[in-house]
Design a protein with these regions (language model features):
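Structural signature of beta-strand start/N-cap positions in the alpha/beta core
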Residues: 7, 64-66, 132
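Active-site beta-alpha turn of Rossmann-fold NAD(P)-dependent dehydrogenases/reductases
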Residues: 9-12, 69-71, 137
Length: 209
């Protein structure tokens, strides 16, 4: 506002959508349920609030601000100690150890390659509409946690490791199973297209871990 910027992008998240009941494409205008009493809800609730502030500044002060709702993003540069499930699977492939899931791995989400996320951000910054949000993902990567583990074990580790679901896994620290298939037609209308599948992303990731 004070610096008279030409444009800014707020990096939001697909977690903003909360719990979606349907296994169908979800557009930017659709939102699911977030339990305000769940302590983990602080993250998606904060994303919703920040997007609202961006929209308010765009409307009241004409600040050119755009929101991108990123799917889980990964590629070269991820730390070897990263705690996220995709990184854990990459480590297991490198170490030749079985992938142990504490849940059944039924949650389904899309992903996007890091470099593609960057091009999406610039696409929105240069061609998007101020105050609006844009989903960013590669629909071809949409799969369950278990399915992703099978891909890593069979294609990345060449069948040398297995995916095992723990019989007595501690599921208390994990979110309830969910599905979230992002509709990216809005950003595609700006000319952006996703390119890289999960196998390609994993191969690139592992080379740099």
């Amino acid at each position: 506002k004070e610096k008279k910027i030409k444009g800014m992008v707020y990096l939001s998240s697909m977690e903003l959508y909360g719990k979606i009941e349907k296994d169908e494409f979800v557009s930017e205008s659709e939102l699911g349920y977030i339990d305000p009493l769940n302590i983990r809800s602080c993250y998606p609730e904060s994303k919703r609030m920040c997007e609202n502030l961006c929209a308010c500044y765009a409307a009241e002060y004409e600040v050119p601000v755009y929101q991108v709702r990123l799917a889980q993003t990964f590629g070269p540069g991820i730390s070897y100690e990263d705690k996220r499930v995709f990184a854990m699977m990459a480590r297991k492939a490198i170490e030749g150890k079985d992938i142990i899931l504490q849940t059944k791995g039924t949650s389904k989400h899309p992903y996007v390659y890091t470099a593609q996320a960057v091009t999406a951000i610039f696409t929105v910054l240069l061609g998007g509409k101020s105050g609006e949000a844009y989903n960013v993902s590669n629909p071809e990567t949409y799969c369950s946690i278990y399915e992703m583990g099978k891909l890593v074990s069979e294609k990345v580790a060449n069948g040398k490791i297995k995916v095992i679901v723990a019989k007595n896994g501690d599921i208390s620290k994990y979110p309830v199973p969910s599905c979230l298939k992002l509709d990216i037609s809005k950003i595609e209308n700006l000319g952006w297209k996703p390119e890289h599948n999960l196998l390609w992303m994993y191969n690139r990731l592992i080379k740099t871990m």
